[in-house]
Amino acid sequence: MSVISMKQLLEAGVHFGHQTRRWNPKMAKYIFTERNGIYIIDLQKTVKKVEEAYKFTKEVAETGKPILFVGTKKQAQDAIKDEAERCGMYFVNERWLGGMLTNHKTIKTRINKLRELEKMEEEGVFNVLPKKEVIKLRAEKEKLEKYLGGIKDMPELPGAMFVVDPRKENIAIQEAHRLGIPVVGIVDTNCDPEQLDFAIPGNDDAIRAVKLITGAMATAVIEGRQGAEEEVAEDQE
């Protein structure tokens, strides 16, 4: 039983690539044909690659390490946030701030600032401060929440990263590689699959296609975490 069926992939439009003039020759092996000036992705290969990525993601989740979901393009933002939250993982869906992985110290300082502002608001400090100052602090808090909210509770560097569109998330991928963090992701016909450790050929511009594949990776995390919990329970018996 495959993780995602051919029917699901077709219905979500995963097979539609980019225009033939916008392509990366390294994607040739994943292209089935060309239709009306658009490349059609070979979904049999997509099914296989989804399964490989699923198995790997599940194994990482079994170790208890966090997995970071990254997708800042409009078509990916909701799926990245929703699916990361569904599997209890972390995400970046607004903008990748340079150094999010490689300059952990600076990012940690900003996260601490966000926590401090949250605490001030919870404890009613905002109610006694001058209105002008509160407006400024709220704006700062909202900005920090927007960019760092999805990673503020991440306990350590991720064991793996999932990305939508490596062209868009190039800096994130470079940082992951520098730290030896494996990267899984969706690659359209204009991408370089060699940038990723586990490349899933597919349409990275259709919301349904992105949601389907991101959802499969989130399910892999849930399955991996459950497996790890069951092992712990058995050990304790």
From Swiss-Prot:
Keywords linked to the UniProt accession: Ribonucleoprotein, Ribosomal protein
Source organism superkingdom: Bacteria
Pfam families according to UniProt: Ribosomal_S2 (PF00318)
InterPro entries in the cross-refs: Ribosomal_uS2, Ribosomal_uS2_bac/mit/plastid, Ribosomal_uS2_CS, Ribosomal_uS2_flav_dom_sf
GO CC term, one of those recorded: cytosolic small ribosomal subunit
Swiss-Prot/TrEMBL GO biological process terms: translation
UniProt keyword Oxidoreductase, yes or no: no
One GO molecular-function entry: structural constituent of ribosome
HAMAP family named among the record's database cross-references: Ribosomal_uS2_B (MF_00291_B)
Family as reported in the entry's similarity comment: Belongs to the universal ribosomal protein uS2 family.
NCBIfam families in UniProt: rpsB_bact
Database matches in PANTHER family: 30S RIBOSOMAL PROTEIN S2 PROKARYOTIC AND ORGANELLAR (PTHR12534), SMALL RIBOSOMAL SUBUNIT PROTEIN US2M (PTHR12534:SF0)
Protein's name according to its UniProt entry: Small ribosomal subunit protein uS2
Species assigned in the record: Clostridioides difficile (strain 630)
Protein's gene: rpsB
